UniProtKB/Swiss-Prot annotation:
Family, as annotated: Belongs to the methyl-accepting chemotaxis (MCP) protein family.
GO MF term list: transmembrane signaling receptor activity
CC terms in the record's Gene Ontology section: plasma membrane
Residue ranges occupied by any Methyl-accepting transducer domain in the UniProt entry: 397-633
Limits of the HAMP domain: 209-261
Source species of the chain: Nitratidesulfovibrio vulgaris (strain ATCC 29579 / DSM 644 / CCUG 34227 / NCIMB 8303 / VKM B-1760 / Hildenborough) (Desulfovibrio vulgaris)
PAC domain segment(s): 330-382
Signal peptide feature range: none
Protein name (record): Chemoreceptor protein A
Length: 669
């Protein structure tokens, strides 16, 4: 209200001062103009009177008629009681006057007015005319002083020695006129004061009703807004500047209210605990997440000191006062204990709020509840321990895999050597079979020519017996070698079975490694960023396990091919051995026949045909055996090649296991 009264007083003082100043100027100018008008009238009257007087006395004076001149002055005295006329000589002595008492006296002694005397003395020296208002004996007179020059027509009386013969001084009593002038001035001043008061009153009433009262209402509404009440309304009647000001203020308040509601909505929409304080560290806003921490309704803390709010939770540090005082951002960690004993680990960040001049007028405190982070840190630590345990298990598996791979490499080396030996034996069998085939062919050729050489039957029969004995012996050797080859192939099949069991162990290890890698990847995914490095390790372990499984499958396929080839070779060798045994039996029969050739010459032809037929069958069987042995040799070489490939794959598995172990060691570090 003091501001409103001050505004009204200022407006009234301004209006009154301006009006008073204007009316004073008008009053002074009016008085001056009235005085000047009055003086102008008096001056023109005095000039006319002096000219009339001069005209009246000019004739008698020019004739030297002293009596006539005196009569003229007497007539003026009788006719114009308010006029005093004096004529002096060049010494200032009064020679003629409307008053007989002052004749022959100096004008300076009669007229007690220093200002007039100065003009009078000047008029005695030079030809001049002066008018002046003067006060003589308390009365106002308008004085007209005129020099009387020594004109030629005056020389006959006064001579030529004095240029100025004297002066005519006429004093007109203007006291009534001046009194009337003052009365008019007083009336003018009175009217001016009345008009001033009326104007000030009307302006005051108008200003109070049309301006001050509306400004006071605006100030009152502004005061409510200052107190935080933005629900007020402004008047909008009229179309003047104050109405537009009301409309602008209403629009501004609406904008501020909407902006404040928007800001409050933004603050309420923030999900982290937050508080806003003013320059005196009082809480202006606190959101629901912050109230959830203290387990109290938010409205209970509005307007309270923020430091007291924090101290009730055991926080001695005044985190906002420091920012309000220094104007710098501040952050740190605190622990807040709620009334129910729950302790919240909190991280705070406080920033100053500044006005448009850069002065700190508040602060905003953002509180981050670290409870979940602490719980996550604890879970991460547990997961880290679990991951280390899994890493130990993976290390054990890798070491086991390395040992198994080393053993498998050793076994594959032995298998490769056995396959090499089998290939060598098969080569020897093939050579023997080729020799046997040549022998059987020769037997068939000899049997064919036996019929033509019947006459040599006894000798040839003896030779045939010997050859048949050799054939039986060679056939027995072929059978023995075939049986040895079959045994070697059986041993190769058994060792292939052993390799299959080792591959199964490797498959089980690879499956277990893949499962452990999958579990480790799951645990690492649960651990989030902390387990990302181990997730990479687990992925590498899983890839190594997959490569191991692929390699073992290739080895299994190679072993299966070896086993199949070995079984086929065993079957062929069994058939070959049986055929060789049949051949050996037939060769023995042939020997018996040849033994009885001498006694049974008549049946030589038939026996020779039988021998030829048997020889042809033996040649055919020998060719089949030769082909089978060649096939066995090819299979053995294939087995040897696959064994080498399996050894390379197993060595790769061993390298992968060592790499897995190195990765796990790196993860531990």
């Amino acid at each position: 209200m003091s501001t409103q009264r001050s505004l009204g007083t200022k407006v009234m003082l301004l209006v009154s001062g301006i009006s008073l100043f204007v009316y004073l100027i008008l009053a002074v100018l009016t008085s001056y103009w009235q005085r000047q008008s009055a003086l102008t009238l008096i001056d023109s009257g005095a000039v006319r009177a002096s000219e009339l007087l001069l005209d009246a006395i000019a004739d008698p004076m020019s004739k030297g008629n002293d009596t006539g001149t005196t009569e003229k002055f007497d007539a003026i005295a009788r006719r114009y009681a308010d006029i005093r006329a004096y004529m002096t000589d060049f010494r200032g002595n009064i020679t003629y006057s409307t008053s007989k008492d002052v004749l022959r006296r100096d004008l300076a002694d009669v007229v007690q007015a220093p200002a007039l005397l100065d003009k009078f003395n000047a008029a005695l020296k030079t030809d001049s005319r002066e008018e002046q208002l003067a006060t003589i004996d308390g009365m106002a007179f308008y004085a007209t002083i005129r020099s009387i020059p020594n004109a030629p027509e005056c020389h006959h009386c006064h001579g030529r020695s004095q240029p100025i013969l004297g002066t005519l001084v006429m004093l007109q009593d203007v006291t009534p006129a001046m009194s009337e002038l003052r009365l008019h001035q007083y009336e003018t001043v009175g009217l001016s004061v009345g008009g001033l008061l009326l104007l000030v009153g009307v302006l005051s009433l108008f200003m109070r009703r049309a301006v001050i009262s509306r400004v006071q209402r605006i100030a009152a509404v502004s005061g409510q807004i200052e107190q935080g009440d933005y629900s007020v309304s402004f008047e909008h009647d009229g179309n003047d500047e104050l109405t537009r000001l009301n409309a602008n203020l209403a629009s501004m308040v609406t904008t501020i209210r909407d902006q404040m509601q928007y800001n409050r909505s933004v603050l309420e929409g923030i999900i982290v605990p937050l508080a806003v304080v003013d320059a005196r560290n009082r809480i202006e806003f606190i959101n629901q997440p912050m109230c959830t921490i203290v387990s109290t309704a938010c409205h209970e803390y509005s307007g309270k000191d923020f430091s007291a709010f924090m101290q009730q939770g055991g926080v001695e540090e005044d985190i906002t006062a420091t920012v309000l005082k220094g104007g710098n951002n501040q952050q740190g960690n605190i622990s807040y204990r709620r009334d129910d004993g729950t302790v919240f680990p909190l991280h705070y960040e406080v920033s100053p709020l500044r006005d448009d001049r850069g002065a700190v007028n508040g602060a905003i405190a953002v509180i981050i509840d670290l409870t979940q982070e602490e719980e996550a840190r604890r879970r991460i630590e547990e997961q880290r321990i679990n991951l280390l345990r899994v890493a130990d298990e993976v290390t054990g598996v890798a070491e086991t895999l390395v040992r198994a791979a080393e053993a498998l490499v050793t076994r594959m080396g032995e298998l490769e050597r056995d396959a090499t030996e089998a290939a060598s034996e098969t080569t020897q069998v093939a050579t023997a079979m080729e020799e046997m085939n040549v022998t059987v062919t020769e037997v068939a050729r000899n049997a064919s020519s036996t019929a033509e050489m019947a006459d040599l039957a006894n000798g040839e029969a003896q030779s045939g017996g010997t050859e048949m004995a050799n054939t039986v012996r060679e056939t027995r050797q072929v059978a023995q070698r075939t049986e040895d080859l079959a045994e070697s192939l059986h041993e190769l099949a058994r060792r292939a079975d052993n390799i299959g069991r080792v591959i199964e162990v490797i498959n089980e290890i690879a499956d277990q490694t893949n499962l452990l890698a999958l579990n480790a990847a799951i645990e690492a995914a649960r651990a989030g960023d902390a387990g990302r490095g181990f997730a990479v390790v687990a992925d590498e372990v899983r890839k190594l396990a997959e490569k191991t499984m692929v390699a073992t499958r290739e080895v299994e396929q190679a072993i299966a091919a070896i086993q199949q080839g070995s079984n086929d070779a065993v079957e062929v060798m069994t058939e070959t051995r049986q055929q060789v045994e049949v051949t050996a039996g037939k060769a023995e029969d042939t020997g018996k026949v040849l033994s009885g050739i001498v006694g049974r010459a008549e049946s030589i032809a038939d026996m020779v045909r039988n021998i030829a037929t048997a020889s042809e069958q033996q040649s055919s069987t020998s060719d089949e055996i030769n082909r089978n042995v060649t096939r066995i040799n090819d299979l053995t070489e294939g087995i040897q090649r696959r064994v080498r490939e399996a050894g390379d794959a197993i060595r790769q598995v061993e390298g992968m296991a060592q790499r897995l172990e190195a990765l796990v060691d790196g993860f531990r570090k």
